[in-house]
Structure formats: structure tokens, C-alpha cells
Regions:
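Short loop/turn motifs enriched for small/polar and acidic residues
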Residues: 32-36, 65-69, 110
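Long, charged N-terminal interaction/targeting segments
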Residues: 1-59
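Short, flexible, mixed-charge glycine/proline-rich loop motifs
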Residues: 61-68, 78-83
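Short functional micro-motifs and their immediate structural scaffolds
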Residues: 81, 94-98
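Cys/His-enriched microdomains
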Residues: 71, 87, 105
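Long, charge-rich boundary regions
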Residues: 2, 29, 105-113
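Short cysteine-rich clusters marking metal-coordination/redox-active sites
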Residues: 73-76, 89-92
């Protein structure tokens, strides 16, 4: 379960920013999550309350925004979304696709006090 390591890293980031920016409490943590990142937000939501006790992240609201997957077709040059169950280019039907986006996982913003 890599979500535990991600949750700890998230809390470490908040603690580091609290020290650097001089805030005492994070109220809201907004994250961007790629459709193909493999991260399960519900696991982070379950782990976060216990893992963040006694830190600047304790009690913060976690918000996730999904970033859709993006692909480039080697056959026709199409760039964009592809139906998951199809796994082929919507323009030419080709299957030589390279993922160019959708694996991301990062903190987009912190609301603090």
C-alpha cells in the first residue's frame, strides 16, 4: 500500500511548509491526481486523520482533483484522451499510443492559518 508512504510524505510536506512559511495549521490541502497514477484517494482519506495527529496537517480537509489521462498516437499524431476500455486512437484506430499525462500526484495548494 504505497498510499501510506504518500500520506506520510504529504504530512512531511505540510510540516516543512509550516516551518518555512510560519503557519501553525493547514486548513485545506488540494491535490491533483492523475487518472492513471494508481493512487487510491479513499485510502489516503482513511489514513490521514491518524497519521496527521499532532502535526500542522491535523484536521485539514483533503481535496482531490483528477487529471485525465492524455495520449499521443504514433500513427496519426493525435493527442488527447482515449477511452479506457478501447485503448485505441479515437481518430485512426491505431494502438501505438504513448501516455503523455495522467500519472501525476502533487499538492496544488494549501489553505493555512
Amino acid at each position: 500500500m504505497h498510499e501510506l508512504a504518500l500520506t506520510k510524505s504529504l504530512i512531511d510536506l505540510v510540516e516543512r511548509e509550516a516551518k518555512n512559511q510560519g503557519f501553525t495549521k493547514a486548513l485545506e490541502i488540494r491535490m491533483k491526481l492523475g487518472e492513471y497514477s494508481g493512487v487510491i484517494p479513499e485510502y489516503i482519506l482513511d489514513l490521514f486523520p491518524e497519521a496527521s495527529k499532532g502535526t500542522a496537517a491535523e484536521g485539514a480537509k483533503l481535496l482531490f482533483e483528477q487529471i485525465p489521462g492524455r495520449f499521443r498516437c504514433a500513427g496519426c499524431g493525435y493527442e488527447g484522451a482515449v477511452e479506457r476500455r478501447e485503448a485505441k486512437c479515437p481518430q485512426c484506430g491505431g494502438t501505438a499510443l504513448k501516455m503523455t499525462g495522467g500519472r501525476e500526484f502533487f499538492v496544488d495548494s494549501l489553505k493555512v492559518e
